[in-house]
């Protein structure tokens, strides 16, 4: 019997890097509402008293960047100066330019199906049957802890909570099956007036216990709640935030490889984002079809070229058919050209702000989480 530990972390919507991601994706959504053909690469930087929104955007749309940025910050919960960051009064700086024509001529084509990739790059997709959402358990439950923190903060259950928080879970595996949770780490910003005893009890009773299945917790599970003992200064006052700096939190929590490209603020012509979504869609349908217990797929693209330059698939010894057959089925059932995958997943819609906190994968509301190809794949594989 082989045993191992595996750990993943998540961060809250009030974490500085996630504030930046949400602003960038809010800008993208507002532009896509008006101009489906827009080219958007929006980056945000937040620090005490300011938000800087920059990047390259080519569009016919008009967006009130300042007002939108303030709205996102306030929606997250930073709307009082006593939190160290206030969406009503912070400075909002705009440093947006246009996308290079050199890039544009390589992407746009007369025939949409010939649309080239917006950049070179490698993207990975992954799925596993260890949870009902075909995601690794450590990242799934780390996200759920952060969603719960936001819920009890916003509904007043724990009104001393503040927006900035982080979670980390260490799972125990035997022969690659979950047998329990070894360690729970949860750090949350809080009001200065609350005692550490109240923080520990509130977090345990209102966040940890409602989220983590009791069957995975035992007397040996270790809990680290605000282990530094105090977390009053948080958000952009504690750390600066930047778009695209939580790429492992956004994906599989380290359980699968990552091509390095961030998602937020990028329109679907950027394969960093759209092809990573398509790769997840492919991997999830393969696992849902029963063709493997775990599946990782790598795609690669060249700038200005429509067809992927490579497709690689790995099932870690869990495949029910040969990997070569799976690659053949992927090519047959999924159009992985940039325009093809945009159409396949209906990506030119204002759906991206919601992706920018609590993970891009394992959340059923997104189109790349559908398992509508599973039955066809299973039949084609002869299972």
Swiss-Prot record:
Enzyme Commission identifier(s): 2.5.1.6
Annotated positions binding Mg(2+): 17
Binding site for ATP: 15, 164-166, 230-231, 239, 245-246, 262, 266
Catalytic activity: L-methionine + ATP + H2O = S-adenosyl-L-methionine + phosphate + diphosphate
Keywords annotated in UniProt: ATP-binding, Cytoplasm, Magnesium, Metal-binding, Nucleotide-binding, One-carbon metabolism, Potassium, Transferase
A biological process from GO: one-carbon metabolic process
Residue ranges of the region described as Flexible loop: 99-109
Subunit structure as annotated in this protein's UniProt entry: Homotetramer; dimer of dimers.
Family: Belongs to the AdoMet synthase family.
Protein name: S-adenosylmethionine synthase
Protein's organism: Actinobacillus succinogenes (strain ATCC 55618 / DSM 22257 / CCUG 43843 / 130Z)
Encoding gene (name): metK
């Amino acid at each position: 019997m082989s045993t191992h530990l595996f750990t993943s972390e998540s961060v809250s919507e009030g974490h500085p890097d996630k504030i930046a991601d949400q602003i960038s994706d809010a800008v993208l959504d507002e532009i896509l509402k008006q101009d489906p053909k827009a080219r958007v690469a929006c980056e945000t930087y937040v620090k005490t008293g300011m938000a800087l929104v920059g990047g390259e955007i080519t569009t016919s749309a008009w967006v009130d960047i300042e007002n939108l940025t303030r709205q996102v910050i306030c929606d997250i919960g930073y709307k009082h100066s006593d939190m160290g960051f206030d969406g009503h009064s912070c400075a909002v700086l705009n440093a947006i330019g246009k996308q290079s024509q050199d890039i544009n001529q390589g992407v746009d084509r007369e025939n949409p199906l010939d649309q080239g990739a917006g950049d070179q790059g490698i993207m990975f997709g992954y799925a596993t049957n260890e949870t009902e959402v075909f995601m690794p358990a450590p990242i799934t439950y780390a996200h759920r802890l952060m969603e719960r923190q936001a819920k009890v903060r916003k509904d007043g259950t724990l009104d001393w909570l503040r927006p900035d928080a982080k979670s980390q879970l260490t799972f125990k595996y035997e022969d690659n099956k979950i047998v329990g949770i070894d360690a729970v780490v949860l750090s949350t910003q809080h009001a200065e007036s609350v005692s550490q005893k109240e923080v520990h009890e509130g977090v345990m009773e209102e966040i940890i216990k409602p989220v983590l299945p009791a069957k995975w917790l035992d007397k040996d599970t270790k809990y680290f709640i605000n282990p530094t003992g105090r977390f009053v200064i948080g958000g952009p006052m504690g750390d600066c935030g930047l778009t695209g700096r939580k790429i492992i939190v956004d994906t599989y929590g380290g359980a699968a490889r990552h091509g390095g490209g961030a998602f937020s603020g990028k329109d679907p012509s950027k394969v960093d984002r759209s092809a990573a979504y398509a790769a997840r869609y492919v991997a999830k349908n393969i696992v849902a079809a029963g063709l493997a217990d775990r599946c990782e797929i790598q795609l690669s693209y060249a700038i200005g070229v429509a067809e992927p330059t490579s497709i690689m698939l790995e099932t870690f010894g869990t495949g029910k058919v040969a990997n070569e057959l799976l690659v053949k089925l992927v090519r047959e059932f999924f159009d992985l050209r940039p325009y093809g995958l945009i159409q396949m997943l209906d990506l030119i819609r204002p759906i991206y702000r919601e992706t920018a906190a609590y993970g891009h994968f394992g959340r059923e509301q997104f189109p790349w989480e559908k398992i509508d190809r599973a039955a066809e794949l299973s039949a084609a594989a002869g299972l």
